[in-house]
Amino acid sequence: MAEESLRTQVNKPSSAFIAVSWVALITGAAAYIIGLFNASMLLNEKGYYLILILYGLFAAVSLQKIVRDKLEGIQVTAIYFGLCWASIVICIALLAIGLWNASLELSEKGFYIMAFLLSLFGAVAVQKNIRDLDYLRTHTQPPSVPNYSNTQFQPIEHDEEKN
């Protein structure tokens, strides 16, 4: 029953939305990484921020997957669902704490926050598009057309006595 209700809700994502999702992911991640590479901070600080974006992207994709699994009626454990949400919150909190204590200009801090959030949004949107397209590919079949090419037709015999 959950599958039927989901089937009516899943629409094929438009090409524009697919493209914008990929652009958001690539732009956000590239801006964050380039900004990190060009930043004048210690190597261990750069490593901290690099791990945060990697952890954040994984947590965001995992959360999107688990929410979609629940919609499709796939059993999801409460502990994993909670861990996914906790990972997102922890990741954003660690970024906020790290930037609060960093000796960066306010504009740089804002840049990192925006690039980070754009990356997370892009990752979730790309994952959603992939999942939607896969669902539509596997759950919608084109109407079956009978193949009569090798069939030999037999004349139908009518019993006129039955009339």
Where are these regions (language model features)?
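Cytosolic juxtamembrane amphipathic/interface segments immediately preceding
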Residues: 3-14, 73
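Transmembrane alpha-helix entry/boundary detector in multi-pass membrane proteins
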Residues: 14-17, 37-58, 80, 109-111
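Select subsegments of transmembrane alpha-helices in polytopic membrane proteins
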Residues: 17-26, 80-89
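Membrane-embedded alpha-helical segments in integral membrane proteins
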Residues: 27-39, 94-97
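Membrane-helix boundary/interface segments in integral membrane proteins
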Residues: 61-76
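Membrane-helix boundary connector in multi-pass membrane proteins
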Residues: 95-110
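Membrane-water interface at the C-terminal end of transmembrane alpha helices
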Residues: 119-135
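Short, highly charged, low-complexity non-transmembrane loops/tails of multi-pass membrane proteins
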Residues: 135-154
